Amino acid sequence: MNTIDKVRNIRISDYNYPLPDHRIAKHPLAAREQCKLLCYKVGGEISEGHFYDVPAVLPEKAMLVYNNTRVINARLRFRKSTGSTIEIFCLEPVAPCDYQLIFQTTQSCTWLCLVGNSKRWKQGPLTQEIEVDGKTVTLEANRGERRGNSFEIEFSWNGGVTFASILEAIGEIPIPPYLNRGTESTDSADYQTVYSHIDGSVAAPTAGLHFTDEVLAECDKRGITRRELTLHVGAGTFQPVKSENIGEHEMHYEFISVQRSLLVDLINAEGPVVAVGTTSVRTLESLYYVGQVLETTPDADEEMLTVKQWMPYSTPCEISTKKALQNVVDYLDRHHAEAYMGSTQLMIAPGFQYRIISGMITNFHQPQSTLLLLVSAFVGVDHWRAIYDYALDHDFRFLSYGDACFFQK
């Protein structure tokens, strides 16, 4: 059986474990950096400390790479005259399709959205009057084309305010469904990393929630290089694998942006690259496959450069990591661009060869999730369960607001 068939035939039931509800952290600790930290070096022993120890446990000359995306207030509620409430959950921009542009629109825009209670939305627009920046604004939502379980929704409004300010005024932070609670006022701060500044995600890159300005400053003191990238996290991050084998599970495409300067730093890195969170892992590892396409097709278009789900398992890896990264730099230079922007659908599962990172900081993930597959691919199929058993036996808190892990090769 070849590699891709082996990977596609992985049974998701092999990545199940018992997770009692009381082990799921419903809120973060008052002091983020006080959370517990499980450390594991592949082939070594498990140890534990606290997140404020991260600057001390990172290897010498490490490069810490984190995701600077910011969670948007993506949930909008419209109350109908009949009394029923329709919830619209903005997933990704359609028109304009550029994240920065769509937030700055001042009259209309279209998003791909999930619609809650859609059976109550028979026809016609939904409207509501809202207060935005001291102005009374009429916001209208029109339902368009259906795409799978989502709809294209066109929003239109008056008053000359931006769509970003509308979301800030009436939108809600979309906390994960497995918290089994509604959004609270504290989530608007708790569910953002201290370094988030690029609007676009509908879920936080939660490994970064533990960082404080003080922890980052201590990293600087110890000579740890800090760099950032962008992956806008989609709702697919909450989606469990429902098929028996992972080959039947389809990953969502997500927008990524990587500065040319980071690519150059990765090429010249003297120490290990440590990714903060699975979103940073997937973005960094996707770069190798972008560079691999450019090796044979230097003038590849956006579609050809999109990293597909099974690409790592079906394409021979014949060039070095540095060559792949240099190909991306050269591509940017030919196009006079300062950042690579594209999409990734990358699935990392056992059988995947990590090419760029040699360490990751991450949380404890849901049973039977693609994120658990990613961790298993890094620490080893035989070791992920021992790590999770240890965490369950030693009172670690799980999922988005829970405790953290540091894994290194």
Task: Describe the predicted segments one by one.
Residues N2-K409:
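Surface-exposed, charge/polar-rich loops and edge strands
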